Amino acid sequence: MKTLNRRDFPGAQYPERIIQFGEGNFLRAFVDWQIDLLNEHTDLNSGVVVVRPIETSFPPSLSTQDGLYTTIIRGLNEKGEAVSDARLIRSVNREISVYSEYDEFLKLAHNPEMRFVFSNTTEAGISYHAGDKFDDAPAVSYPAKLTRLLFERFSHFNGALDKGWIIIPCELIDYNGDALRELVLRYAQEWALPEAFIQWLDQANSFCSTLVDRIVTGYPRDEVAKLEEELGYHDGFLDTAEHFYLFVIQGPKSLATELRLDKYPLNVLIVDDIKPYKERKVAILNGAHTALVPVAFQAGLDTVGEAMNDAEICAFVEKAIYEEIIPVLDLPRDELESFASAVTGRFRNPYIKHQLLSIALNGMTKFRTRILPQLLAGQKANGTLPARLTFALAALIAFYRGERNGETYPVQDDAHWLERYQQLWSQYRDRVIGTQELVAIVLAEKDHWEQDLTQVPGLVEQVANDLDAILEKGMREAVRPLC
């Protein structure tokens, strides 16, 4: 069986205009996949040079396949049909290691055509590393490497204002563009680089904050033989991902034209502020997950897909989204409903087995950040507690018993909550406390909730009533009136 290379698989090759820090599965099935579509359907005509930002020899270099690899995008499409689409990606030209090819790395700045910098160096990548110096070959941190590369470009083109870059980080931190820019400026000042360079950074370059959204399942280890048989070639960099994707970029409106988004419709939004989109994702996608998990798991289900194929549990989640979460969010309702529809479709993806117990990790913090804001906003707006979000809190407290149908299961959270719940449920079983007292103790934890939730009118009583129903009737019977 042939292995991918450009000699045996000839096709388009594009001039290098994009530098990408990070060789991982996510960028390859997200950014490079989108660039490949734009190259095919528009005159974007841009090739990617991947820079491996850390010192590692695994996985091998993409250059062993001349930058070629296959994405397999699968899930439910907009009509709810299961689809699986294999695509040979030609947007990546080569990969270089900043550690073994440092001079080659600096030479990227000399190419007048270079225009974009994308990155995904993990959440820890956009951080300050004390001791990084200008002359290090290379510096340790990604922001320091980028500062050095930007200075190389500034010097090579004598500070020309038309030679700046559009820098688009994809790391999962809030306002990642602002954070990266601040660190680049910090290194520039620490290294005593000329004031003219600092002015050029501001005038000629754009640091764009982003929100990225796609589940990338990566190399399909268990299915490789079958997939390669279907493809007819060997691919050591096969990359799988869900059908849904969303790329929100906070940047200049001109970016849409530069990326040729006006010529081919991708799910990319160029916006003035990513905040409402971040809130939408946290509230609807993450919030629905967090509400679903303790209810579905204690109803005897194990995966998100099983839960969405269960008529009652699915109805509970959809009503929570449409009746209790969406009404208190600050974006146009039709936009929110369209996003919610995509979310429930993603939950039904038959190609992804998303274990409920793995999503249950750190459930107490997830409830505080993902659901509590909507629960409180709903109470404030309507004067009544949103029934399903409140029930989800009772289900969460019940989940920390760590037992389903007489069998124990692992509960993963910080030590404080594990010990606290062990103690509280033990006291409940010994009849030292009742449900009302148990709930009040949990809701009074100011350090966790950042407020005393026992002061929210009716909350302790309603959560305790829901908890009683769960303990007495079982989850199925208790949740039914809310479905």
Swiss-Prot record:
The keyword Oxidoreductase applies. It is an enzyme of class 1 (oxidoreductase). The keyword NAD applies. GO terms for molecular function: mannitol-1-phosphate 5-dehydrogenase activity; tagaturonate reductase activity. SUPFAM superfamilies: 6-phosphogluconate dehydrogenase C-terminal domain-like, NAD(P)-binding Rossmann-fold domains. Keywords: NAD, Oxidoreductase. One of its GO terms (cellular component) is cytosol. Pathway: Carbohydrate metabolism; pentose and glucuronate interconversion. NAD(+) binds at residues 18-29. InterPro entries: 6-PGluconate_DH-like_C_sf (IPR008927), 6PGD_dom2 (IPR013328), Altronate_OxRdtase (IPR023668), Mannitol_DH_C (IPR013118), Mannitol_DH_N (IPR013131), NAD(P)-bd_dom_sf (IPR036291). It catalyses: D-altronate + NAD(+) = keto-D-tagaturonate + NADH + H(+). Its EC number is 1.1.1.58. One of its GO terms (biological process) is mannitol catabolic process. Belongs to the mannitol dehydrogenase family. UxaB subfamily. This is Altronate oxidoreductase.
